[in-house]
Amino acid sequence: MTIEFDRPGAHVTAADHRALMSLFPTGVAVITAIDEAGTPHGMTCTSLTSVTLDPPTLLVCLNRASGTLHAVRGGRFGVNLLHARGRRAAEVFSTAVQDRFGEVRWEHSDVTGMPWLAEDAHAFAGCVVRKSTVVGDHEIVLGEVHEVVREHDLPLLYGMREFAVWTPEG
């Protein structure tokens, strides 16, 4: 199937855009936060990128209807980069299950106190919200990284609507 995006007058639908982005494999993260009542929230996210090294800042794009975004607006969030064995966590946090945190082992991170999926993430960043802006049905959130935990493991990837594992051999 060929989708033409450069035709004059062509209208790109949400389905067209989703199909385009499925062709861009990326790592898989679970964004976590705690709301004002102390309840943890989280969602699977592939819209994540580094912004600057000084100060260390990243951005995530979250659906405006997300309960996780509401908790992130409290000022802090965690980025859990999932390893190859973290697929189940990716699936749990991409569903409408109410008690997602009851399905995985997690703990509060040392510095920011954000939910860290220690058994499913090979890296964790605890962030403080510095700025956010609404674009369409999503909100772009800039987070200054205040905490990093890393382990050596192979990352979980997602592309072409499938999970995969990075292999050093290629």
Swiss-Prot record:
It comes from the Bacteria. Its EC number is 1.5.1.30. Keywords: NADP, Oxidoreductase. It catalyses: reduced riboflavin + NADP(+) = riboflavin + NADPH + 2 H(+). The keyword Cytoplasm does not apply. InterPro entries: Flavin_Rdtase-like_dom, NADH-dep_flavin_reductase, Split_barrel_FMN-bd. Signal peptide: none annotated. Pfam families: Flavin_Reduct (PF01613). GO terms for molecular function: FMN binding; riboflavin reductase (NADPH) activity. Catalyzes the NADH-dependent reduction of FAD to provide FADH2 for the halogenase RebH. Belongs to the non-flavoprotein flavin reductase family. This is Flavin reductase (NADPH). It comes from Lentzea aerocolonigenes (Lechevalieria aerocolonigenes).
